[in-house]
Amino acid sequence: MKTLLFVCNLLLCLGITGCRQNEKELKITAYVNPFIGTDGHGHCFPGAILPFGGIQLSPDNPRNGWDWTSGYHYSDSIISSFSHTHLSGTGIGDLQDIRFLPVSTTPDTSISPAAYIQSGYARFSHRNEQAEPGYYSVVFDNGIKTELSVTNRCGIHYYQYPANSAHALTIDLTTARNWDRTTETSIRKVNNRTLEGYRKSQGWANDQRVYFIIEFSQDCEVLAGYKKFSPLENGQKITDKGCYLYVDFGQKTNKILAK
């Protein structure tokens, strides 16, 4: 009798194991929708994050206000930047540090750097937008495709430009939204593919500091300045109350990786 029970239990266990092996792998992340909470008064953002990670890389709209405390609201149709820090679910806005925006135009030196960067804010449709855990992508109306992902301490940007356009990127260390205020910025061109710097601000924290290193997959020429653009040469450093950058990758390739 004991032998019979042992054999039955063994066959039952083998049967259960076989069933489990035949089951399709269940990907729980397929049920996650990062756009939940980005409309109404949800105050959430749809960008790329990791659990307990130090980077929240997500699109920003060019608006202030209670519904834009996360930087993004689903009712909007303009993206002003992809910045690296965000708050989610809060009723007050802050962060949105180190703003990137791929552009397909050359700089207009007849206007201020701030005005030029604002002129590059891009229209988009939610039909061309996608988000899943750790990943975000969008195609602007001007044809530029952006894909975002993250590691614990690094934001990863992949840009694909129309072949017949400028292949460039603006970096905004100055603009602050809602209750944030920029107090000091610094940028240094280390070499043809590397920048380093910081942004200091006041908001929830009286003295917030974000230090960064930016690496590109292609050589670039850089214009930088607060009130006007000037060439930023290798080894040169600019420190001011604010700074805007225009990074030109030339025409060797229309696919750029930045991190």
Each language-model region and where it sits:
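Accessory carbohydrate-recognition regions in carbohydrate-active enzymes
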Residues: 23-259
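Bacterial Sec-dependent N-terminal signal peptides
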Residues: 1-24
